[in-house]
Amino acid sequence: MSQKTVKVQLVRSLIGTREDHRATVRGLGLRRLNSVSELQDTPAVRGMINKVSYLVKVLA
């Protein structure tokens, strides 16, 4: 059975954000504005997305 995945896109700039939020975005594999990362859909990843939900958009 294949793992479920989720695609995340960085849609807002990291300028002026908290340092731990920047680290969370880097942990999601996002570097530049509009970059997309495909990750396994786990509770840890969901928590990271929830923490920086004002910066990212979930695509799938």
Curated annotation (Swiss-Prot):
Tell me if Hydrolase is a UniProt keyword of this record: no
User: Can you supply one Gene Ontology CC term for this chain's record?
Assistant: cytosolic large ribosomal subunit
Choose any GO biological process term that the UniProt entry carries and state it.
Answer: translation
Which residue positions does the secretion signal occupy? none
MF terms in GO = structural constituent of ribosome
Q: Which HAMAP family match?
A: Ribosomal_uL30_B (MF_01371_B)
- What binding partners and quaternary form does the record give? Part of the 50S ribosomal subunit.
Output this protein's name.
Answer: Large ribosomal subunit protein uL30
Source species taxonomy? Bacteria, Pseudomonadati, Pseudomonadota, Betaproteobacteria, Burkholderiales
Q: In the UniProt record, what gene is named as encoding this protein?
A: rpmD
